[in-house]
C-alpha cells in the first residue's frame, strides 16, 4: 500500500481532476533504490565519456513551465525509425533539415508568445497519422486543441498567428527561459492581444498522451533511457489507449527519466479540458507503479515534477 502524504503542493488546486499525493512506503523504497542503482549503472555503462553520469541521488525539483499550448511537430517515418537519436540535433531551433527546420521558424514567429511550448515527437503507435519521409506537409499536433494540423511551410507565419489568436493571459516566462533555469524567479502574467484567424481547421483526435523524453543529442541519458521506458510501456501493456511518443528536450535531463501525461477530463463531452502531469526519475522498473497509481487518482511524490490544468 502507498501512504498518503500530508504535504500540499500548489498545483493541486488547479487540476480538473482530484489527485491524492502519495509516498512510497519504506520497504518498497528500499527495493526501488536497489533496482534504481543497478539500472543507473547499466545506463552509465552505455553513455559517451562526454556525458555526465546518471546520479539517482539528485533531488527532483517540483517545477514545470507554465504554458497554454503544447505544439508537437510529428516526425516522419514509422515507429522503428530513430529520429530522436539521429535527426534531432542538440538544439532543434538550429536544425536546417526538413521538417525540423520548421521548429526554429515557428518559434521565431511566436517569440512574443512565451506560453506556447514547441517540441518534436516520434510516435510509437498508430492512433495519430504521421507524415512520410519527404512529405510536403508539416504535421503539428496541438494540445489542448487535440487536433492534428497539416501545414505548408509557406503558411508557418500564419499558423503561428492562428496558434496565438484571441486575448490570453500568457506567462512572461518562456519555455526557453525555463530550460535555462529562470523558472526559479517569480513570474507575473501579462495580457497579450493576437490576430483572429480561422483558416486552419485540423482533425480532432481525443486521446490521452504519454510522452517520454528521448532526445539523445541533447543528453545521452535521456536518449538511452527513453526507449527503455517506451519498451516498458509496451511490454507491461500500460495505458495502451494513450498516444505514445518520444519527445525532444523538456528540461530535467540532469536527472532524466522525464515523462509527461496529458489526461483528458470528460473527453466524451469534447470539452478539451485536460491535466498536464510531469514526472522525472521514471525508470522502467517503477513505471508500472506510477501508471497504476495515476489511473487511480494518485500521484507519487518521489517522481512528481509538477503540473497544470489546460483548457
From Swiss-Prot:
Pfam families: Suc_Fer-like. Coiled coil: none annotated. InterPro entries: Aim32/Apd1-like, Thioredoxin-like_sf. Belongs to the AIM32 family. PANTHER family: ACTIN PATCHES DISTAL PROTEIN 1, ALTERED INHERITANCE OF MITOCHONDRIA PROTEIN 32. This is Altered inheritance of mitochondria protein 32. It comes from Saccharomyces kudriavzevii (strain ATCC MYA-4449 / AS 2.2408 / CBS 8840 / NBRC 1802 / NCYC 2889).
Amino acid at each position: 500500500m502507498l501512504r498518503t502524504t500530508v504535504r500540499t503542493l500548489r498545483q493541486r488546486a488547479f487540476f480538473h481532476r482530484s489527485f491524492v499525493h502519495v509516498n512510497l512506503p519504506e520497504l518498497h523504497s528500499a527495493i526501488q533504490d536497489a533496482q534504481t542503482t543497478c539500472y543507473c549503472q547499466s545506463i552509465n555503462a552505455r553513455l559517451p565519456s562526454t556525458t555526465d553520469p546518471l546520479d539517482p541521488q539528485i533531488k527532483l525539483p517540483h517545477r514545470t513551465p507554465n504554458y497554454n499550448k503544447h505544439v508537437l511537430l510529428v516526425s516522419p517515418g514509422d515507429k522503428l525509425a530513430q529520429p530522436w537519436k539521429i535527426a534531432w540535433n542538440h538544439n532543434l531551433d538550429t536544425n536546417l533539415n526538413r521538417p525540423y527546420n520548421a521548429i526554429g521558424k515557428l518559434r521565431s514567429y511566436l517569440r512574443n508568445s512565451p506560453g506556447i511550448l514547441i517540441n518534436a515527437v516520434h510516435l510509437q503507435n498508430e492512433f495519430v497519422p504521421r507524415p512520410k519521409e519527404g512529405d510536403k506537409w508539416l504535421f503539428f499536433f496541438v494540445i489542448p486543441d487535440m487536433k492534428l494540423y497539416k501545414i505548408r511551410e509557406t503558411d508557418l507565419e500564419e499558423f503561428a498567428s492562428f496558434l496565438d489568436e484571441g486575448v490570453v493571459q500568457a506567462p512572461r516566462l518562456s519555455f526557453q527561459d525555463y530550460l535555462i533555469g529562470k523558472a526559479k524567479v517569480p513570474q507575473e502574467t501579462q495580457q497579450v492581444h493576437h490576430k483572429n484567424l480561422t483558416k486552419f481547421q485540423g482533425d480532432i483526435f481525443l486521446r490521452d498522451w504519454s510522452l517520454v523524453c528521448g532526445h539523445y543529442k541533447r543528453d545521452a541519458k535521456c536518449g538511452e533511457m527513453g526507449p527503455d521506458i517506451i519498451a516498458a510501456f509496451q511490454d507491461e501493456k500500460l495505458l495502451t489507449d494513450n498516444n505514445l511518443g518520444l519527445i525532444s528536450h523538456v528540461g530535467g535531463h540532469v536527472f532524466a527519466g522525464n515523462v509527461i501525461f496529458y489526461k483528458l477530463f470528460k473527453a466524451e463531452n469534447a470539452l478539451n479540458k485536460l491535466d498536464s502531469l510531469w514526472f522525472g526519475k521514471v525508470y522502467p522498473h517503477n513505471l508500472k507503479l506510477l501508471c497504476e497509481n495515476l489511473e487511480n487518482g494518485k500521484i507519487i511524490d518521489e517522481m512528481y515534477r509538477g503540473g497544470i490544468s489546460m483548457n
